């Protein structure tokens, strides 16, 4: 039976609502007779702002509350930044759709005092704000003379902290800045040879209940095949390494002539050890490429690095 109403669970942050409202508008265009409502809520990751993300714990930090709404029948789908969605989902739920990816790169944002600087020219001891261990480890590897400081809160709050002088610069996702209308604050797109992006960064993931094919049929209009293949390879790589969203694992993926090339990286928190490699194969079988690349990095010592990190940033009781 065709659905007449679709309920979307979403985080209530400004960026999440921009993303969810885009999904809502696109689905309304594709299905004019469908009534779509949004239920916005705060997640654990939204509520705890005085503890580093890695110390809170990793599993479903920004997704668990949304998934609970679907599991009890109060929502049919949930919209996530794909980089926040764990690779192992709760029983009964599935990743139903991956939307077209925007620029997945990290971006440098500076305050007025540092307007003439790029990453390469920041002075010794300049304070870089980031809440991501992935960005932290890679930037420490390339720029050990810089100082790094955790930064939490939504994008607007972070920009206010930057402009008030708490930080010399911030590292943020380019896609998030663009979606919020802050593309003009992007001072430099950080190249992949300096900072590989997060798994799924720049794409949205729509999660849904497994046993409702009518819901899957509705959301599949937003599926972007190229993005989906790239992100499935990236997620398989992350899952095989048993890494979560808050560990120093970075990726880049490209598809050319039906060949998918995946680059992956694991680094120690101090940036002194960084393992990077790539794997290629048929874009029609993306997960096998992610699994192959994870095996390569494990063989080079990635497992030992990740174990050290898990022990070091083990969530506080």
From Swiss-Prot:
Residue numbers of S-(dipyrrolylmethanemethyl)cysteine PTMs: 245
Pathway recorded for this protein: Porphyrin-containing compound metabolism; protoporphyrin-IX biosynthesis; coproporphyrinogen-III from 5-aminolevulinate: step 2/4; Porphyrin-containing compound metabolism; chlorophyll biosynthesis
Pfam families from the UniProt entry: Porphobil_deam, Porphobil_deamC
Molecular function terms from GO: hydroxymethylbilane synthase activity
Gene Ontology terms: biological process: chlorophyll biosynthetic process; protoporphyrinogen IX biosynthetic process
Keyword Transferase listed: yes
InterPro entries: HemC, Porphobilin_deaminase_cofac_BS, Porphobilin_deaminase_N, Porphobilinogen_deaminase_C, Porphobilinogen_deaminase_C_sf
Subunit (UniProt): Monomer.
HAMAP family: Porphobil_deam (MF_00260)
Descriptive protein name: Porphobilinogen deaminase
